[in-house]
């Protein structure tokens, strides 16, 4: 399944240009509900270096109009950090980029997954130049109303080890690779 060309106009940052946009590609390597083990923890595949470009583009994509979020010059003079403020769910960009295409946490990309709940806690704003490492922990796995739920906790630390944010992400997932294949090939 090719990514529609109309999405290309939204691809502006260097990270976006290299981000795999078609989640149907490589789904065979994604972790499934059956594969996931509660308590399993590990680092994401990639780190994420925070840039003004990343924050500005995400804020604009969210429809923000506050000059503290979309006008770098205004933010330099008026923001408490002297930098653009981030949209509260900017952390999801870090997660999707960092998780990569194989290993723990990749179930977040699974074709057919549904997102019934998420909770994000911002401990302190990300700053330009910070190198963010994401640690993924499978925190819960259960069946409710006949549907397989999986929850992971993502902790985002900067290069100094300071915890910057936490994201509890829950998805209803296809249980097995065969279930994912039925959805992906439909």
Regions found by a protein language model. Give the residues of each.
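Hot-dog-fold acyl-thioester-processing enzymes
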Residues: 2-117, 178, 182-186
């Amino acid at each position: 399944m090719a990514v529609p060309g109309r999405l290309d106009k939204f691809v502006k940052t260097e990270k976006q240009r290299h981000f795999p946009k078609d989640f149907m590609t490589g789904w065979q390597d994604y972790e499934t509900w059956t594969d996931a083990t509660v308590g399993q923890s590990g680092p994401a595949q990639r780190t994420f270096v925070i840039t003004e470009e990343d924050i500005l583009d995400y804020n604009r994509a969210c429809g923000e109009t506050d000059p503290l979020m979309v006008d770098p010059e205004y933010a330099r003079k008026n923001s408490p950090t002297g930098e653009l403020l981030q949209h509260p769910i900017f952390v999801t960009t870090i997660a999707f980029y960092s998780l990569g295409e194989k290993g723990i946490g990749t179930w977040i990309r699974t074709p057919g997954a549904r997102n019934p709940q998420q909770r994000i806690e911002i401990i302190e704003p990300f700053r330009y130049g910070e190198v963010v490492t994401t640690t993924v922990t499978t925190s819960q796995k259960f069946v409710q109303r006949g549907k397989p739920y999986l929850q992971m906790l993502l902790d985002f630390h900067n290069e100094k080890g300071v915890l910057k944010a936490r994201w509890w992400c829950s998805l209803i997932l296809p249980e097995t690779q065969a279930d994912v294949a039925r959805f992906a090939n439909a």
